[in-house]
Amino acid sequence: VNEEEPTVLHGYMSNAGFEDVRQTIAESLNRRFGTSFAAKNLIMTVGAASGLNVAFKTILNPGEEVIVFAPYFLEYGAYVRNYDGNLVEISPDTTTFQPNLKEFEEKITPKTRAVIVNTPHNPTGVVYSEETIRKLASILEAKQKEFGTVIYLISDEPYRELAYDGVQVPYLTKYYANTIVGYSYSKSLSLPGERIGYLVIPDEADGSEELIAAAAIANRTIGCVNAPSLIQKVIAKCVDAEVDVAAYDKNRLALYNGLKELGFECIKPQGAFYLFVKSPVTDEKAFCEAGKKYNILMVPGSSFACPGYVRLAYCVSYDTIMNSLPQFGKLAEEFGLKA
């Protein structure tokens, strides 16, 4: 990177980002997932959050609907409202936290413009199975035909590489043509402050050329102009860097097994670095407050449109995990769980 011409390294470029960087990422995706992307299919963005805003700016008309599966990252609602859209929630299936496809099919209307999926999932750590993705895609294809509309599937993928036990994370453009992928390097390379990511818009998407051009302009008009130039060049040098998930996996198993032994109920996470735990009392916010007495910080499930649960993050040191377990034991005892 030091060998780059400074006026290029720190200068303006196409709103879509440096072409050589986009081509390098496209080739990496093609090797990994058997896709056929080129530089033109990628828009470099200021992280995934900005990428989602670019996508909604590009596709949403006022009053159109975006469907999301609870629990979900609550800022999705703000992103949709930024462009006068309406968020439609699908209630969770708390037995598996796979998408509730029956309710999903019932809530698709002629106003439905997009559906957001996030896998590996925040806050549950669940990975949507290939069977789930195929069924979801089939429903969308049938509804597009029924209503004569285009419905985009927005795949928010900041945790893609963080998967355990050999679990495969399906690449959604291979299952549904009208997919837009939003990716961030914040989690995979631990670069959240650098704000770098991208959108993928495949050629197979309806009106792809116009969609790609509109997304590049949207990148500018929402105020980003372009993704940070320096970190774009850095990313191009490490697109095939592999994430060492061993430390996360060690923490995952220690925390999950430790809490289960104490009597807590939780789904075993397959990806990301979160554990979604059922609160032993109806008011999970009170449970979170009680945890603070033992230096345990939890996020209430109502912050993800799923009350009655709490989210724990295990992206900390192994010592922190192990030192927390006796404190969780005290918390379990306070709430009458098996200790």
Give the positions of each predicted feature:
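PLP-dependent class I/II
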Residues: 1-5, 13-16, 20-339
